[in-house]
From Swiss-Prot:
InterPro entries: NSA2_fam, Ribosomal_Se8/biogenesis_NSA2. A motif (Nuclear localization signal) lies at residues 11-18. The modification Phosphothreonine is found at residue 81. There is a cross-link at residue 80 (Glycyl lysine isopeptide (Lys-Gly) (interchain with G-Cter in SUMO2)). One of its GO terms (biological process) is rRNA processing. This is Ribosome biogenesis protein NSA2 homolog. Involved in the biogenesis of the 60S ribosomal subunit. May play a part in the quality control of pre-60S particles. Belongs to the eukaryotic ribosomal protein eS8 family. Ribosome biogenesis protein NSA2 subfamily. Residues 20-42 are annotated as: Disordered.
Amino acid sequence: MPQNEYIELHRKRYGYRLDYHEKKRKKEGREAHERSKKAKKMIGLKAKLYHKQRHAEKIQMKKTIKMHEKRNTKQKDDEKTPQGAVPAYLLDREGQSRAKVLSNMIKQKRKEKAGKWEVPLPKVRAQGETEVLKVIRTGKRKKKAWKRMVTKVCFVGDGFTRKPPKYERFIRPMGLRFKKAHVTHPELKATFCLPILGVKKNPSSPLYTTLGVITKGTVIEVNVSELGLVTQGGKVIWGKYAQVTNNPENDGCINAVLLV
């Protein structure tokens, strides 16, 4: 046995101290507090490097937790479905000609490119920057004013990772992040609570679109897979656009009309 491993040798012969495991548990419990105290006291380049390292660790930890959660959730097994099986709502579409389907698809794509959507609200009031973005003063003497906090409802995707708070320019509060919208189908005259996939266009500013700000008149993309809508080719439609018709920041919910 190497000369420097005398502690391991002693433990093999006589076992651990009686209070060893208790002491270890308490030390691990204190570690988080000690690390945070260290982070608060550090200044300069050392602090920057330390915060960067801690930020990377936190991201890794969150990703690991998410993976564990995914592992525990039950997922539908697609392999059990027979290969030739067709859902009931597609049975009458078997004899449709391929050429007709293709021409309709091309027409639809051209229509989408041209952006010929008849929206329920063609004109909406523009939202000013002072109204949407509140100035946050930072620094020891509160002299810096480059940070902005979004004061309207916004959508943030699942894969979004925050920058370290020190370098984050636009802050989107958790209380204003929405994931679902109440979407009304104009032909069916029914309302569904559907998950939001993204913000297509905010009429006020391209900046609001990139930030995912949802105000009255914003066009959002929603997941309509549970509605059972299908294309002429028999494929299930996954996402569709809808326009927001209310002021979500006042009502506490997003009401939208599906664009069909």
